[in-house]
Swiss-Prot record:
Residues 1-21, 1493-1529 are annotated as: Disordered. It comes from Cryptococcus neoformans var. grubii serotype A (strain H99 / ATCC 208821 / CBS 10515 / FGSC 9487) (Filobasidiella neoformans var. grubii). Coiled coil: none annotated. GO terms for cellular component: plasma membrane. ATP binds at residues 881-888. The gene is AFR2. It holds the Pfam family ABC_trans_N. Keywords: ATP-binding, Cell membrane, Glycoprotein, Membrane, Nucleotide-binding, Repeat, Transmembrane, Transmembrane helix, Transport. Belongs to the ABC transporter superfamily. ABCG family. PDR (TC 3.A.1.205) subfamily. PROSITE patterns: ABC_TRANSPORTER_1, ABC_TRANSPORTER_2. This is ABC multidrug transporter AFR2. SMART domains: AAA. Pleiotropic ABC efflux transporter that confers resistance to structurally and functionally unrelated compounds including azoles such as fluconazole (FLC), itraconazole (ITC), posaconazole (POS), and voriconazole (VRC). Disruption phenotype: Does not affect the susceptibility to azoles. Causes further increase in susceptibility toward fluconazole and itraconazole, when AFR1 and MDR1 are also deleted. Residues 144-394, 845-1087 form the ABC transporter domain.
Amino acid sequence: MAFAGVGQGLGTYDRTEQTSGASLGRVASRAHFTDTHPSDDLPAQTEEHRAREVGHLARQLTRQSVGGTDDSSALFSYQQGSDLDPFSDKFCARRWTKLMFEALQTSGPARKAGLSFRNLDVHGFGSDADYQKTVGNLPLVGIGALRDLISNRKRKVQILNSMDGVLEAGEMLVVLGPPGSGCTTMLKTIAGEMNGIYLDESSSLNYRGITPKQIYGQFRGEAIYTAEVDVHFPNLTVGQTLSFAAEARAPRNPPGGISKKEYAKHMRDVVMSVFGISHTLNTIVGNDFIRGVSGGERKRVTIAEASLAGAPLQCWDNSTRGLDSANAIEFCKNLRLNADYIGISSAVAIYQAPQAAYDCFDKVSVLYEGEQIFFGKTTDAKQFFVDMGFHCPSQQTVPDFLTSLTSASERTPREGFEGKVPTTPQEFAARWKQSDKYQELLAQIAEFENKYPVHGKNYQEFLQSRRAQQSKRLRAKSPYTLSYGGQVELCLRRGFDRLRADPSLTLTQLFGNFIMALIIGSVFYNLPATTSSFYSRGALLFFAILMSAFGSALEILILYAQRGIVEKHSRYAFYHPSAEAVASALTDIPYKVINCIIFSLTLYFMTNLRREPGPYFFFMLISFTLTMVMSMLFRSIASLSRSLAQALAPAALLILGLVMYTGFAVNVANMRGWARWMNWLDPIAYGFESLMINEFHDREYECSAFIPMGPGYEGATGQQHVCSTAGAIAGSSVVNGDDYINLSYEYYHAHKWRNFGILIGFFLFFTAIYMTATEFITAKKSKGEILVFPRGKIPRALLAQSTHSHGSSDDVEGGKFAGGSKMKKQITGADRADAGIIQRQTAIFSWKDVVYDIKIKKEPRRILDHVDGWVKPGTLTALMGVSGAGKTTLLDVLATRVTMGVVTGEMLVDGRQRDVSFQRKTGYVQQQDLHLETSTVREALRFSAVLRQSNTISIKEKYEYVEEVLKLLEMESYADAVVGVPGTGLNVEQRKRLTIGVELVAKPALLLFLDEPTSGLDSQTSWNILLLLRKLTEHGQAILCTIHQPSAMLFEQFDRLLFLARGGKTVYFGEVGKGSHILIDYFEKNGAPKCPEGENPAEWMLAAIGAAPGSHSDVDWHQAWINSPERVEVRRELARIKETQGGKGEAALQNKDHEKSKSEVKAEYAEFASPLWKQFNVVLTRVWQQHWRTPSYIWSKAALCALSALFIGFSFFKSGTSQQGLQNQLFSVFMMFTIFGQLTQQIMPNFTTQRSLYEVRERPSKTYSWKIFILSNIVAEIPWAILMGAVIYFTWYYPIGYYRNAIPTGAVHLRGALMFLYIEMFLIFNATFAIMIVAGIATAETAGNIANLLFSMCLIFCGVLAPPSSLPGFWMFMYRVSPFTYLVDGMLSTAVAETSVVCSDIELLTLNPPSGESCGDYMSTYISNYGGYLVNENATTACEFCSMSSTNSFLAQFNIYYSNKWRDFGLLWAYVVFNIIAAVGIYWLARVPKNTGKEQASEPEGVQEKLVPAQSSEKKRESVSRGSESTAA
């Protein structure tokens, strides 16, 4: 819907009535306009009638405008509660529309858009099927891609074939077809979204004189495409989200003399009123993880946002998904009104279109596997196919009939037409093109093109109208409305709104950095102004500069979180992506300034860095500048990549390179010539140099240790002793700071401000890259629906299709072959299975007076209110109700799946209480199709069968049963297909079938629950699913199924109905009856209006009880049920079931138990069907398979290990045993530890994927134990850790040359083997540590942040940056607790102990002995006490002394001793065991429900079953507390 002035001229609104109580302002009714105007409620009328009516309205409005009968100023200066107040119950949309039309007359005619298309051919490049990538075959993919690149070979895939059509301004087109037929591609092509799809040169499109190139560029935003997914900033309120859209497209000169901001606010209020979301003004939008508005309301926010874009041509792709049919009809009616009075053209794809919605449209296009089989008036379509020879059942709606034609199993030829009707898509298309209707269409297209020549009069008017709305500061061909500065300002305001809405990350980072500053400040507390602090000052500044630099690394994740939203807004022409980039960077500046001040103040003055104003402010300046530079660098990486994985992989290596070549770990003098360029390109290096110069320049430091010193040297004076520090001069008691950094680091004071200038240059360079990349590089193209198979298992039929280049695109639809009729014919060879294989059930499940109470925000709320019912074998029972009635909650309560709150009432199986085995004996098909994406269909079914069927059944029998279920569900054609993700894997229907299959193969002994099995499916697929359920019930399956607004044909498939009103109150429980007559009779006799002939009973019932939008009922239907004789009969039947079945069940049970051994009886009632050892074996195999089939995980792990090890190894290549060489070897171990964080973050997402599946589906169904889940995930990581350890060992140990240190000791092999074991322990510790941290935490991101904090602590206190001798006493416990202490101790002592030191020339200290003494005589006492050696023992002047002779002396400075090697190795095993035990313990504490699920034996009526809050995990607590709102849909 386009709204006046936002896009162009005139908008039409319905009134929203707000109600009290639970609905609180949800649209209860949209009152019809008071004027008599038939088009509001009747089906779409003829074009002639509508043209007359619009002309009449225009003349009437013009007369009113001239005569001034209705003051248009009242539009914006209305009184509260008047008929122009959008928040008022009296809001009159028609009057508002008339006034807005008058007000906008002054700005010229409204823009209108229509289009014609001839020979529309669209293709992509891809295939219909692909093979699954694994660790083993991934290299082959690279070779194949290289071959294709060299040969320029692309596989062209045709999506749309030769389509024709015309859509005049003010007309509405509905596009019908099953998923994969090309509906999405058609809409995207019309709207100009050509990302990954291509238009053939022969295709012709004409947008009323505007070319496709102009629509896609200059007029982007005038034709928009709205996808079915809802992408919004979750923490912004609905009001903020829609205000932004309204302001972004507000015209330059709003009517009524008001400001743009006031105008945008008014438009927002009106559009919210129209879509019934005024009550959500201050509610956050939310998403799948953040609670906000309900799913249906979020969908309406998406629709409202697109409406505010004001495009004259709008394409809506399944935008009614998630809305019930009543709201879907309202949406279509609103589009109809816009089309009639403004001239908006709409093209809408709807999967389950109610008849009333279909009647709103002028034209329909029917697609069948990429072929157009009809395009014309909606009133002509049905007759066209009936004349062709097809039968339309009387109870079938026209849209369902048209969609059914694309399914061979659903379409029915009329008598006498068998064999004469078309059967393939190509035959249908050929028949269409031979028809008279097609010739009429071609004539209409020709007329349209003659009327609107390219760049004719209409184009000029369109251009003028658009230009009048744009800012004067915009170039003529800009698609945007606001100037660039205006866009930045708008995005900046939104940025601060987002910050205020969710400051948690910012505050957490501020607090975390403050804590880190305190810790580091205390470690290096009050450094003395002596030479003993030189190393510590360097280490401190190194750590400080890294904290400033890498504080922005998380910005990669933040940018990817908002990328989809920014790209959507760019398509709507709200703003330049680069404007949002500028605003985003500016929004972060206040945080960065505050963080810099807090961090600098704390660290700088605690550690006694140079306490002078100039140096302090320079320290802050460099820290802040470097923070900004690195922020832009990370943002550039995110913007240059198309997926998060592409961004994170180079970022990890880049961070390592930047740290290595800062100048501390490897100083400039020791950098290899071939790697020196990395230092020149490293921004951190320039910052570090400036901070070192800032600290050391022009300062004299007292010498803390002279050589020689001690007994016998008390009288040494002048040049007879020298300070033991680089830069010292013999005889001087102080060391000049400049001399020290010149000699040790090659840093010079002249570089101080030069480096600042270089940092500014880096900032400008990265900012330019960031803004350019943001503007031009879009996210990864979405792949089409293609099936994926393990290598060697792709069916021949699909291989043949791929070869012939017909199928899907990279972009959207490939499901047309993946599940299409052609494939089914060619691949399916097996006969259909008989549903008789389903285990026939005999138990009756009944419930009585079920009540469920929970607390929300400490307020008690009743979700279910005394609900009664039963499910008998061989019956299909529907559970229906309004949104929020508690349908899903009732299923969860009955299936024992709620984990908090209080449940009361009776739930009996054959009159007896449910036992601990109840959950595994029932099947629960959830609404979300959750499966492990790396498994194949057959493997997913086998996994469920092996673990959930009785352990007494052999594996062979279980596998045979799986094959039967595959046939029954008609899944054998894709039994070997990989589940994958939507788009690359199974399509929606196939996933739903698999979800049902997983529960069926478990042989549920009691019943099957299904939650919304048809949600999001097209009508054809929904029908197939219902037929399948019907087939199951005919063979004894008991089924209870929630369903949302079924069509009349679907509704007839159910035997019984349980209908709930809001608050979980029963409205009806009983039989439906043939033609729904029992149900209809009940409601009619209790006061409902008569059900019209041919009406959908489900929709009639909702309207009759006042549950549909626009409906009202004076009857209290819950009370009517309570007082009804039908309820009395239900209660009588429940008592009978309990009495008769209870006795029978007990007797049958005892007989059955007598026939079985004790162990068999125990197994029958056990919590799990399989023993623990079997669970471990099966689950471990699946986890291992998941790793093997996720090559991105294993190869990125291997790449990180190999490349990091090689990078470190060759940066410290062949490090010698000079003092600097030893320091290099120390830092080579330290730098190897820095990959710990990245390795941890690679492990966590894989674990959370498995955990989500386990906790949502497998744990509630008692598939296997939580202990098995944790242990199998840990064990599966160990082999990969060992393999990666070997990779690191060979690429790191040998290049550095550690093995050469062992040659003098004769223990080369022993020490090499010991180093190998230590590296393995490092990686095993890493794997177990990662799982321990993530075990109890909801998201991998949060766990990653905690792991990084702990890792940083371990790194600081391991004894490298701050040797134990310099640590304050209260931090010594951290030194002893840190596992890295023992790793450093073991690895470094194994690497360099027991070897001689050979000083380099610059490390030699020069002094003169007393006259008459040789150097050897003078220094002998000192050497015997403290070690070291003389180069020239016999000299009498200029003694050259090296302060170390053995590497053991160097190691002793860091408290490292070779004798501890086996102690350290044993302690590391202790840490690993601790991690495993802690992982199990933390998971149990945080995420395992503590209620065991056992129930008391039958007690008198009213017994309470208390379900204590079972989990401390916030996520679980929230999901249960949502029972009343979102899950109770």
